[in-house]
């Protein structure tokens, strides 16, 4: 991840399991100097930011905090993890409709404050929501990326390791 280096500001929108895990990884590896967590549930974002600060006290220095869209000014990278999880019995089409509405409300707000950032969309279903993010934001498509099939690739690697009795890293 050569793009994210010291001196860079990263904003993570969505402080749920995925957003918090991404934020923690960025902090523990020292891949940015500023890390902002934004969530509609402000106490959740605050709690996750505190957990990351306390959990990385002996790691490279990263300024971790919670905030609002306006605090994302000068972000170099924005990671979007918003959306609801699929409920039992819910179709992927219904999930897509719900999460597209959420994306349509988030993107215009964040792009007001971070129009020059690169965006990584991690929300599900990622391909549709990446397209939605581009459409509703007006951002240059070259600056908006979907996480794509990373999870599928990880699952394949895990299965290959299990059936071949080898370490996960043997299948890179």
What are these model-derived regions, one by one?
Residues 92-157:
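Rossmann-like NAD(P)(H) cofactor-binding subdomain of soluble oxidoreductases
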Residues 19-20:
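N-terminal Rossmann-fold NAD(P) dinucleotide-binding loop
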Residues 15:
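Glycine-rich Rossmann-fold phosphate-binding loop(s) that bind the pyrophosphate
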Residues 34-35:
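Short beta-strand element of Class I
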Residues 38-74:
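Conserved N-terminal Rossmann-fold NAD(P) cofactor-binding segment
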Residues 61-116:
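Rossmann-like NAD(P)-binding element
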Residues 166-172:
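Conserved small/polar residues in nucleotide/adenosyl-binding loops
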């Amino acid at each position: 991840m050569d793009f994210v280096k010291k001196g860079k500001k990263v904003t993570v929108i969505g402080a749920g399991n995925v957003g918090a895990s991404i934020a923690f990884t960025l902090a523990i590896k020292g891949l940015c100097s500023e890390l902002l967590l934004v969530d509609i549930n402000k106490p959740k974002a605050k709690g996750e930011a505190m957990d990351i600060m306390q959990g990385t006290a002996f790691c490279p220095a990263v300024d971790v905090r919670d905030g609002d869209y306006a605090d994302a000014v000068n972000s170099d990278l924005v990671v979007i993890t918003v959306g609801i999880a699929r409920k039992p019995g819910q179709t992927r089409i219904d999930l897509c409709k719900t999460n597209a509405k959420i994306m349509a409300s988030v993107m215009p707000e964040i792009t007001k404050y971070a129009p020059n950032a690169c965006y990584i969309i991690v929300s599900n279903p990622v391909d549709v929501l990446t397209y939605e993010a581009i459409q509703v934001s007006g951002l240059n498509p070259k600056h908006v990326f979907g996480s794509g099939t990373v999870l599928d690739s990880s699952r394949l690697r895990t299965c290959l390791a299990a059936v071949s009795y080898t370490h996960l890293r043997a299948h890179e």
